[in-house]
A protein has these predicted regions:
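Phosphate/nucleotide-binding beta-alpha loop and adjacent structural elements of enzyme active sites
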Residues: 1-24, 28-44, 50-285
Length: 286
């Protein structure tokens, strides 16, 4: 299969765009997208946020405004680049509402340093992608695979919507975790994902191993785990890495915490080192 025929790369399209390009959202995702804009010579014309978060603060030199203020200046014929991720229903509804009224894309950027999923990436990995596609056993899985490729290339939300599955369907019919799971949570926050897993296993598990580097989040995780779960539970105040070492960590509290060039020196751990030969059957990373 020629995967390059599925869709045009969002980056190529944005390079050719003559209409104003505005970012919806701030934070790590927007940082990464604007870095690619700089590298590729794509010009952003503004940044807006949901009305309740638009306070006129500066982000990369742009005043963060409401959409209504943005369109009052630039007009309605704009390209909106969604620059953050969410699974909250009300936020997704807002994204879909924007998609219905504007030209909207959500570029896929790597969470950690690495290549973009663009034409060059597809050309380099097309043989691997073909082998993965052929391993899939049913038509629905193959279509989800193709829609994922289409989305990662184009940034079009419709491809994600085509492949959505409700949380109950995912846990009860696809992942189907059971009482014998050895669960490793890399970036455990306050234990929210562990709680979710235990909801679907009726509180049963073989072991839980959780890493969380942020000191405030780890305290909440420890308090919750001590009060609510018993058994083979290992909580480690450390970030997940490919080796055991000390890294600077910007602990801005909660989900915005990240490895940085400056910040608090923080222990990082490789999961293999933490497990020390113990099994892992269910792995969550973020």
């Amino acid at each position: 299969m020629d995967f390059l025929t599925l869709e045009q790369s969002v980056w190529s399209r944005l390079k050719e765009e003559t209409r104003p390009i505005v970012l919806y959202g701030m934070g790590d995702g927007a940082d990464k997208i604007l870095a690619q804009f700089d590298r590729l010579g794509i010009r952003a014309s503004g940044v807006f946020a949901s009305d309740e978060f638009a306070r006129g603060n500066l982000f990369h030199g742009f005043s963060v405004r409401k959409l209504s203020d943005t369109t009052a200046e630039l007009g309605e014929d704009i390209v909106i680049v969604i620059s953050f991720a969410s699974q909250r229903p009300e936020v997704l509804a807002k994204m879909y509402e924007l998609d219905a009224g504007y030209d909207v894309v959500a570029p896929d950027v790597p969470v950690v340093p690495g290549p973009l999923f663009d034409e060059a990436f597809v050309r380099e990995h097309s043989a691997d992608m073909q082998r993965a596609y052929e391993l899939l056993a049913d038509e629905r899985s193959r279509e989800v695979f193709l829609d994922t490729v289409r989305f990662k290339l184009s940034g079009r939300l419709k491809y994600l919507r085509n492949s959505e599955s409700g949380k109950d369907e995912v846990f009860e019919n696809i992942l189907r975790p059971g009482a014998d799971e050895h669960f490793s949570d890399l970036g455990a926050y306050n234990g929210d994902t562990i709680r979710e897993l235990l909801h679907y296993t009726d509180g049963r598990f073989a072991s839980v191993t959780a890493l969380e580097p942020d000191r405030r989040s780890f305290r909440k995780l420890n308090e919750w785990a001590s009060a609510n779960i018993e058994g083979d539970v290992t909580l480690v105040q450390a970030g997940a890495w490919d080796r055991d070492e000390i890294r600077c960590f910007s602990d801005q509290a909660g989900r915005q915490s990240h490895v940085a060039n400056k910040g608090r020196e923080t222990q990082m751990r490789a999961l293999d080192s933490v497990l020390n030969g113990r099994p892992c059957t269910y792995l969550k990373m973020d």
